[in-house]
Amino acid sequence: MRLRAGASSDVGRLRERNEDSFVVKDPLFAVADGLGGHLGGEVASRLAVDTLTSEAGADGPEDGLADRLRAAVHQANSAVAERAANDTRLTGMGTTLTALVAGRDRIYLAHVGDSRAYLLRDGDLRLLTEDHTLVHKMLLEGEINEQEAETHPHRSILTRALGVDGNVQVDEGVVEMILLVEHLRDPQVRLGRVERGQPAALGGEAQAISVGA
């Protein structure tokens, strides 16, 4: 499978420091959005991406890619938690992480937080991940509607993030790329951080990685 990839990140208009990190290193692609403010968020996202790259960035057997990716995310979680525990300036830091490893015919996903992975197919953009936020949980439980979720004051509160819990729960998925190739001239998988509280689309404020086959 031939891959084309690109990445960009912008601090935006509201923050002074860019707390996002990414990796575009075939077969590994990932985005991370740091939490904790000041130095912490930037350190957490960079550490998570660096650990992920070290543990899952090399080519390996197809049948072991999902296991390697899962283990790498858990290793990244431990690395962020350990750094925060050993440096009082970084107390409370954490990060989201949405990553994929490309195999021969499949793409393996791992996800924690509210960064997002999308599948772009025949012009349709489909969300592949679920936001781990308090507001999304409230939405699923019927406590609020989608319009209320977009402006809810707690829409930035995460229910899962790397570095916060020693045994983080990782969402996983598989995209069968061979099926996409049969139907598409230019199939793409996109990973991005969409502004929190904007559940509908990958817009201009998103940091994104797109992978085409």
For each feature predicted by the language model, list its residue ranges.
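Short, intrinsically disordered C-terminal tails of secreted or membrane-associated proteins
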Residues: 205-212
